[in-house]
């Protein structure tokens, strides 16, 4: 079982080094904030430690256990089954491609049916 409880945002990465010195590329999205020292930095994205050191990203073969919230931005591909015990809350769109089976009950989602019919 692999426990997912944090996130590695990385360090100084290629996008930050190649981006302009200030503005959107320097201290903003791909500079010292989100890209260079953040999400796409040394650990996670297109940086150096990702391919060389295998940074933590909550992926692997086996089971993944999540306690708390697991926010996901971007695309997440899941191959296999995802059994869920408890409640799942989607804020926004939840697009699914392929075959999706959902078993559960309508428990006050706001649709007005109030049905206990399993679907």
From Swiss-Prot:
What superkingdom heads the lineage? Eukaryota
Segments of this protein annotated with the region Right arm: 103-119
Q: Residue span of the signal peptide, if any?
A: 1-6
Region annotation (Central domain) maps to 54-102
Q: Where are the sequence repeats?
A: 28-32, 33-37, 38-42, 43-47
Q: Among its keywords, does the record have Transmembrane helix?
A: no
Q: Where is this region: Left arm?
A: 7-53
Repeat listed as a keyword: yes
Keywords (alphabetical) are: Repeat, Signal
Q: What does this protein do?
A: This protein is one of many from the eggshell of the silk moth.
* Family per record: Belongs to the chorion protein family.
Q: Can you say what this protein is called?
A: Chorion class A protein PC292
Q: Which organism is it from?
A: Antheraea polyphemus (Polyphemus moth)
Which lineage ranks, top first, belong to the organism behind this chain? Eukaryota, Metazoa, Ecdysozoa, Arthropoda, Hexapoda
